[in-house]
């Protein structure tokens, strides 16, 4: 059995938030509070090149960070709950 390289498919995206990318391109943001801010190209969101097709933001997320989803050109659906009160510049 050999080892194979696999792209990072989960991690943190804020002090109390986690992200997970499913095999079929669904990005799930979970936890409570604010997302981190990102910038292009030096501090890009970790899912930037993963071909995200759908985003589901969890019920306790309050802020979507700068440039969080700015390069997700394959998006077909985004679910944002009422708990999100701030969407920062260039988030999409």
What are these regions (language model features)?
Residues 1, 14-15, 41-44:
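A generic local structural motif
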Residues 25-33, 50-63, 73-86:
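Structural signature of tandem-repeat unit edges
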Residues 46-47, 63, 67:
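Amphipathic alpha-helical interaction surfaces in cytosolic regulatory modules
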Residues 20-22, 48:
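Extracellular/periplasmic catalytic domains that process cell-envelope and extracellular macromolecules
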Residues 65-68, 88-91:
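Consensus positions within tandem repeat domains that build extended binding/scaffold surfaces
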């Amino acid at each position: 059995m050999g080892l194979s390289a696999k792209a990072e498919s989960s991690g943190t995206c804020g002090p109390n938030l986690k992200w997970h990318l499913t095999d079929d391109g669904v990005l799930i943001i979970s936890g409570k509070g604010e997302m981190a801010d990102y910038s292009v190209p030096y501090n890009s969101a970790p899912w930037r090149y993963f071909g995200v097709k759908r985003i589901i933001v969890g019920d306790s997320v309050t802020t979507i960070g700068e440039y969080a989803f700015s390069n997700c050109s394959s998006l077909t659906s985004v679910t944002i709950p009422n708990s999100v009160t701030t969407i920062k510049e260039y988030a999409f």
